[in-house]
C-alpha cells in the first residue's frame, strides 16, 4: 500500500523533465528499422508531492552501451541554514551512495577540516564493501530471495497490479511526446543533454560508487 501511495503522489513529468538518447550505431543493429525512434537511454526528473519529499527532485537514468553496468542510489544532502565553516569556504554537498552493482557497497562523502590553524576543508570518504568485510560469504542470487518468498507466501517484494498500472500512467504521457533521442558514443555515460538536465539543481551524475568509475 505504501508503494502505491508514493506513486499516487508523483507529479506528472513533462518534456522539460526527460532526456532521451541513442548510442551511435544503434540504427545499424540487426533487426532495427532505419527510421526507428526507439531510445536506448533515458534520464528523468520526478517530484513526489507529499509531506516528506515535497520540493525534492529525484533524478534517474538508465541506458545501454554505457561505460559499465552500475546500479546505485545517491542522495545529495542540502546545506544546513547555519554552516560551521565561513561563507568564503567552498563546500561541496555531502553524499550518501548505496551501491548494488558492480559490487555491494555503501559510501559516505562529507567535508572535514584539514589539520592546522587555517580553515581549509577537504571531502573525505567512509566506505563499506560487502566483499571486503565478509569475504566469500555469498549474497543470495537475484531470484533466490523471490523464489523463497513465493514459497513462503510473502508478497512484500513483489509488484501488485495497481502499482504497475500507476507506473505506466506516469510513463505513457512521456512516450506520447515523441521526443527525438540525442546521440551519444558507445562506452560513455549518455548524452550531454542529460548533464544539463541535472545541472539545473547544481547537481551532477555520479558515475559508479560516487564517481569512482569516472575517476
Please state what every model-predicted region is.
Residues 1-215:
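Secretory/organelle targeting and membrane-embedding segments
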